[in-house]
Each structure stands twice: as C-alpha cells, then as structure tokens.
C-alpha cells in the first residue's frame, strides 16, 4: 500500500486524452457504443488549473526546487516529487500510476467500510459485530456470519463460498472494466466512463480533470488511513473510532508513542 502511494502512473492512460464523442462508425458499424475514446496525446484540462502544467502546485510550495524533467504536470496528483526516481522509466511510470489509482479506490471503500459500521454501532444501531477486523472472523464461529446481524439477509458459514462469490462478482466487474461487455467497449480501463459513470460526472472535461485530482488526493489519504487502521488493530485490538475515543479521553496515555514504547507482540 505504501509503495502504491508513491506510484504515479497508469499503463493504459499514460500519454492519452479523452475524446468526448465516438465516431459514426463506432455507433453504426457494429451497433456497440465505446465508453470513452482516447487520442494519442494528453491535453491539459485548463491553462489556468493549479493542478496541471509546469506552474502547478508543488509538494513543498515555493521551496520545492526544480521538478524532474519527466514530471511535467500532465497527470493528476503530480506534485513534482520523485526522490527515488520511480517514474523515470515511462513504462514503469504508466504501470505504477494505474496501480496507484486502483489502490486508491479500494482504500477509500475500505476506509469507509472500517469506520461506518463502528459509527453506526456507537449511535445505537445494532447489527452484530461492528469492528472491521472482528466482523469477518465471525464466519468461523459455530453460528456463522449474518450480514447486518440479520440472518434473513445473508447467512454465511463457508469462507470458501464467500471467496468464490467475491471472485465471480468482482472478477466480472473488473473484466468488464478492462475488456468491455454487453453495455459497450472500454478503451480506457482506468477511467472507463459509460456505465461506470451513471451520473455523468465526467461529461465536462475541466470538471473531470479536477475530479481526478480530488480522487487521487483522497485516495492517498485513504491508503495511509488503512495502514493506520492495520497498525491500530494489531497493537490495540480495537477499531479506529474506539481508539480515537480513547485518545480524546486520555491523550497522555493513549497515543502512538505510549503504545510504541510498551507494545509487546502477542499480548
């Protein structure tokens, strides 16, 4: 996760831009609609955007120094920082950028899934185990796992069945995102649009470019959050909101330094 946070590229989108309308042959030739076409060269969303181009926001503001020549501000999330040279090779740049965006999306969903059930439980909503790393383990109990604490919804007793469902359902969605499906072909798997954008949020190019920046910024924060949730679970055995409540109640004794100096694995 930490590695993907530093990655800045996508194998399928590097060096490409959105073409808003398909050609007539795409519409009438084979009866299928292409979700989003790409051209050969990416074009900045707006000359006045603070997030793109040579005058974009940098990682240390006016103290950032000169950015590497290969970080031109063409892609969202490029703050001109690559101390380790991870993006120097164009193919690696493209691959890492795609990995980062996908991990960002998973991390945002994961962070919400870790916090929201615990938030509901702390406000009186009863639906079984709310702590994220404890909820899944209930499937190994004798009674199995009831989704939302209601056996009439989904009652799971087999981890293999859950795994198979995940593979089939998520595999189908990912396959559609990458290779297209009955609702249309996908040319840009990283930003497929079409059925993946039912609200039409990407219809306006400038708004779409800004949304890409918001996505990558929030996704990076979410990846760090998930890493923090993992560490908290191992060290304290509690959920993130319970840890936060403990810290606010007694910040002197409940903080990262106090746990780091007293942590003994297995206890």
Curated annotation (Swiss-Prot):
InterPro entries: Chloro_AB-bd_pln, Chloroa_b-bind. The chain crosses the membrane at residues 101-121, 153-173, 221-241. Residues 1-35 form a transit peptide. Chlorophyll b 1 binds at residue 59. Chlorophyll a 6 binds at residues 247, 256. Chlorophyll a 3 binds at residues 138, 148, 215. Keywords: Acetylation, Chlorophyll, Chloroplast, Chromophore, Magnesium, Membrane, Metal-binding, Phosphoprotein, Photosynthesis, Photosystem I, Photosystem II, Plastid, Thylakoid, Transit peptide, Transmembrane, Transmembrane helix. This is Chlorophyll a-b binding protein 3C, chloroplastic. It comes from Solanum lycopersicum (Tomato). The gene is CAB3C.
